[in-house]
């Protein structure tokens, strides 16, 4: 893409800010069960019919425990259905390539992966998943997992806003309205844009052809060109910050991401809902300035990390100098139509959000550039983050910032008129510690096992980074990978599945517990010690985020990508 990096980045942020207001306002209406949207004339009858068929009383609200149980049951049923579809796809329709059943341990890993919004892929979609399984076993969880995250965020926002109430909403009403009024219309719109750029949408059998370079060779072997309903799945893959590709090359494949314009639209789609949720939060608590302050904190962090990734990658490979190569640019693992900036830009966007879609190979980045996507995920997927999970993730850090600020000035911590007590802090720390323990603990377990070291594609610090990246990606529900790691073995598939499951649901429960606790509190007029807007808020929140991430991950990063960077400088590679 020939556009100046500065212009493209500026346009991206400007569009994100402009779209924040209408989409955030729409979210506010969607997450209010009495809210009226522009889609009511078409979708209201369908919504009411769904309530009737499912025997849902929309007027009844739930405690945080009931809300959590509802979300968990909804997701567990989804995991089971996806698993069965993947195992039985050989006898199900829409399978022109006669693809057989997926192996049990891979199906287990995949079902959990898509239900938890991770979309880690330990399989080759073109060879191992039928059209039916793609649409019903994988695309449907793309919607349900996104709706789950948004519903959990809405429950936390209600907990902050409400006073002396024991309920945080109705999970079934939230899930239905999020699907009908938000995800489906947006997905249709993005799918049409992608179709206009050349993304396929069909049910044809794969096309056999002989590439030009093979016609003159003795091989003369036909190659199969995949087909399928790609555009429809691509849209929700991005909007729902899911990330699982219809094709193995993901958004590097021209069928999923054919042009620079489609690339820009895909990146914008990833951040669209997480960004708008900050405006929804500001509307809900009647403090738009506070919502914008959170958005600015996210944006500043995003700019710093994106530019760092680009600068590190643009510096090139120092090993080229010893080979007499003048052009040191590292184009390995990158598409020529995107180049270094758009590859670095996409990598930063997809790892700051819990998306995991890729348009380049992160494993081929220079050590410090590859460290940025890893560090992004280690922050906790809260710089815009996943749909829903980004908002409740950063609100955890707001609560911790409030607590630390209150301790420093000797005042009882308070946030938007609510007291932040020991219970809220314990739940917030529990949600964060679960992630850190899983990432570092499971990485250590894999690196100290024979099956773990046997899966390494590279030795030395790069091999350590591959394993650390895998468990960070799965625990934080991102799904991107350092491709040098062979994670298809039974131990890896099962352990990564456990990481995804615990990293999603064992974080969700403390979030909803905080929502229930805050909703039950009175609002104290004087309980606003911590500023909810301005540069002090942005600085304290940003510092808290980076401080906690640095304390937890810096030791691992020093013996991984940082060590590899210095060793490459000395002429050693892995």
Swiss-Prot record:
Job of this protein: Part of the high-affinity ATP-driven potassium transport (or Kdp) system, which catalyzes the hydrolysis of ATP coupled with the electrogenic transport of potassium into the cytoplasm. This subunit binds the periplasmic potassium ions and delivers the ions to the membrane domain of KdpB through an intramembrane tunnel.
Q: Which gene encodes it?
A: kdpA
At the highest ranks, the source species' classification is:
Bacteria, Pseudomonadati, Verrucomicrobiota, Methylacidiphilae, Methylacidiphilales
Q: Report whether Membrane shows up as a keyword of the record.
A: yes
How does the protein associate with the membrane? Multi-pass membrane protein
Gene Ontology CC entries for this record: plasma membrane
Query: Which terms are listed as keywords in the entry?
Result: Cell inner membrane, Cell membrane, Ion transport, Membrane, Potassium, Potassium transport, Transmembrane, Transmembrane helix, Transport
First-listed, main subcellular location of the protein, grouped into a coarse class: membrane
What domain of life does the native source organism fall in?
Bacteria
Give the protein name, as stated in the record.
Potassium-transporting ATPase potassium-binding subunit
Q: How does it assemble?
A: The system is composed of three essential subunits: KdpA, KdpB and KdpC.
Secretion signal span: none
User: Which residues are listed as membrane-spanning?
Assistant: 7-27, 65-85, 136-156, 175-195, 264-284, 292-312, 390-410, 427-447, 494-514, 534-554
What family name appears in the similarity comment? Belongs to the KdpA family.
Entry's Pfam families? KdpA
Where does the record say this protein resides?
Answer: Cell inner membrane
Q: What is the native source organism of this protein?
A: Methylacidiphilum infernorum (isolate V4)
Q: What GO molecular functions are on record for this protein?
A: P-type potassium transmembrane transporter activity; potassium ion binding
Per the record's keyword annotation, is Transmembrane helix included, yes or no? yes
Which InterPro entries does its entry note? KdpA (IPR004623)
């Amino acid at each position: 893409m020939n556009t100046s990096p500065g212009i493209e980045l500026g346009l991206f942020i400007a569009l994100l800010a402009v779209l924040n207001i209408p989409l955030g306002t729409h979210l506010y209406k969607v997450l209010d069960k009495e809210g009226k949207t522009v889609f009511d004339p078409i979708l209201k009858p369908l919504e009411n019919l769904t309530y009737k068929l499912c025997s849902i009383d929309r007027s009844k609200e739930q405690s945080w425990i009931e809300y959590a149980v509802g979300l968990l049951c909804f997701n567990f049923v989804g995991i089971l259905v996806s698993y069965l579809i993947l195992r039985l796809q050989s006898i199900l329709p829409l399978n022109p390539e006669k693809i057989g059943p997926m192996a049990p341990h891979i199906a287990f890993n995949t079902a959990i992966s898509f239900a938890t919004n991770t979309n880690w892929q330990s399989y080759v979609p073109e060879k191992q998943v039928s059209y039916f399984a793609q649409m019903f076993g994988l695309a449907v969880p793309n919607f349900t997992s996104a709706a789950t995250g948004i519903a959990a965020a809405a429950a936390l926002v209600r907990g902050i806003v409400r006073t002396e109430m024991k309920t945080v909403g109705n999970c079934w009403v939230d899930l239905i309205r999020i699907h009908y009024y938000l995800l489906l219309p947006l997905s249709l719109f993005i799918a049409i844009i992608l179709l206009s750029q050349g993304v396929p949408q069909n049910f044809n059998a794969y096309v056999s052809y002989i590439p030009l370079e093979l016609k003159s060779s003795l091989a003369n072997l036909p190659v199969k060109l995949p087909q399928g309903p790609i555009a429809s799945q691509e849209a929700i893959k991005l909007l729902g910050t899911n990330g699982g590709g219809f094709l193995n090359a993901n958004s590097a494949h021209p069928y999923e991401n054919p042009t620079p314009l489609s690339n820009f639209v895909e990146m914008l789609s990833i951040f669209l809902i997480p960004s708008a949720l900050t405006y929804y939060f500001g509307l809900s608590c009647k403090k738009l300035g506070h919502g914008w302050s959170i958005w600015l904190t996210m944006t500043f962090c995003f700019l710093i990390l994106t530019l760092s990734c680009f600068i590190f990658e643009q510096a090139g490979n120092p090993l080229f100098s010893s080979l007499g190569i003048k052009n040191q640019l590292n184009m390995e693992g990158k598409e020529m139509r995107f180049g270094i900036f758009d590859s670095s830009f996409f990598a930063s966007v997809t790892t700051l959000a819990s998306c995991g879609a890729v348009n380049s190979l992160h494993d081929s980045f220079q050590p410090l550039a590859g460290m940025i996507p890893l560090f992004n995920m280690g922050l906790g997927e809260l710089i815009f983050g996943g749909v829903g999970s980004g908002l409740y993730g950063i609100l955890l850090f707001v609560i911790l910032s409030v607590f630390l600020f209150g301790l420093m000035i000797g005042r009882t911590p308070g946030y938007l008129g609510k007291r932040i007590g020991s219970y809220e802090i314990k739940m917030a720390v529990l949600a964060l510690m679960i992630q850190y323990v899983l990432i570092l603990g499971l990485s250590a377990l894999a690196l100290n096992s024979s099956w773990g070291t046997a899966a390494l594609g590279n030795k030395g610090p790069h091999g350590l980074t591959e394993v650390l990246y895998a468990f960070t990606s799965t625990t934080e529900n991102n799904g991107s990978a350092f491709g040098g790691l062979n994670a298809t073995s039974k131990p890896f598939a099962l352990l990564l599945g456990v990481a995804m499951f615990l990293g999603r649901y064992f974080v969700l429960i403390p979030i909803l517990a905080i929502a229930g606790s805050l909703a039950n509190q009175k609002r104290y007029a004087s309980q606003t010690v911590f500023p909810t807007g301005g540069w002090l808020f942005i600085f304290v929140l940003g510092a808290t985020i980076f401080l906690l991430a640095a304390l937890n991950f810096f030791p691992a990063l020093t013996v991984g990508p940082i060590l590899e960077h210095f060793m490459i400088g000395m002429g050693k590679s892995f």
